[in-house]
Structure formats: C-alpha cells, structure tokens
A protein has these predicted regions:
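Short, solvent-exposed polar/charged micro-motifs at secondary-structure junctions
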Residues: 1-2, 101-102, 144-145
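Polybasic low-complexity intrinsically disordered regions
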Residues: 1-96, 149
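Hydrophobic (often cysteine-bearing) scaffold residues that line and stabilize catalytic clefts
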Residues: 51, 113, 142, 146
Length: 174
C-alpha cells in the first residue's frame, strides 16, 4: 500500500496514535461527563497525545470538582497531586503490578460504572455522527464535531448513573 497518498487533508495536523483497538490516524476527543451523562467539558488532541495531558490543562477541568473517575490509563502520582490541589480527587483502578490501596466502597461501586462513559462515546459516534473519516477541511471537521456534541446534549435520554447516599456509610444504586 502506498501511504504517501493517504491523509492529505490533515497532513500537518493529524497524527498516528495507538488505542486499545489498535493504531489510528487523526485526533482524540476527551470528554468529562457527570452522573447524568451530560458533557461538562471536552477537548480535542492529536492522536499521539497522552490521555493524561488534557487533565493538566486548567480550562479543561474548570467546571469539575469532587471525584473524577478514570481508567488505568490516567494513573499518575504527579497528576493525582496536581488535581487534588484543585479540589479534584482522581479515582482509578490499580494496575496489576501496583500495591492494593484502600478505597471507599462507594468509589469502588462507581468505578465499576465507568461503562457509562463508553456508552456516551458510542452515542456520540453512532447517533450524533462525530466519527467521520472523509472531512475535507479542519473547519468542517470541527463544525461536525461541535454540532454532534450539541446534538448529544439535546438527547432526551442520556446514559446515567442513578444513585443516592442513604447515609454516610451506604450507597444505593438503581
């Protein structure tokens, strides 16, 4: 295959990155959602940018406080300290080679509900059509992405986590 003919539109902007699904060329959409599935913040980076980098950007997390749940890719002592100073507690699973640390039961339960973010990603791609491989300009790419995010925000039913604190030591999930 002749790769020189590929990726001309974004040749100076898009990069190649690796995800759990393999290699891809383009960009990454980073989103922060709340328990009701509403998008609080989003950021677009090149494909080769570390997933932790947007979390270091103050403007990306300005609407966020409290607990932030992420996957193992967000594990970083430095990032944990940086966010903690800003009033954000980063909660992730531990990697296999790490020491087990104590975690509140409610945090453990909520960490298992991370599939909600995957559902949001799926709805953005399949219902709101943000994943598109044939854009002919950066402007069209960004217009389509922002329109898709706006359309998602107007969806009547979003993936969510229904829970309430019964008292200081109990958590109810529905």
């Amino acid at each position: 295959k002749n790769n020189k003919k590929r990726n001309k539109v974004f040749k100076d902007v898009a990069t190649t990155g690796k995800s759990t699904m393999g290699w891809f060329h383009g960009f990454k959409l980073h989103i922060v959602i709340n328990d009701r599935g509403e998008i609080l913040s989003f950021c677009v980076t090149q494909a080769n940018v570390d997933d932790r980098e947007p979390l270091k950007n103050e403007s990306f997390l300005k609407a966020v406080f409290g607990k932030l749940f992420g996957d193992k890719g967000y594990i970083s002592k430095e990032l944990h300290k940086l966010l903690f100073v800003d009033g954000i507690e980063l909660i992730t699973n531990i990697k296999n080679n790490m020491k087990n640390s104590l975690m509140l039961l409610s945090d453990k339960i909520l960490l298992r509900k991370r599939s909600v973010i995957e559902t949001v990603n799926d709805e953005l791609k399949n219902i709101c059509q943000v994943e598109h491989s044939r854009h002919r300009s950066v402007t069209n790419f960004l217009s389509n992405l922002i329109a898709g995010i706006i359309a998602y925000q107007f969806l009547p039913k979003k993936p969510s986590i229904k829970f309430e604190h019964l008292n200081s030591s109990q958590l109810a999930l529905y």
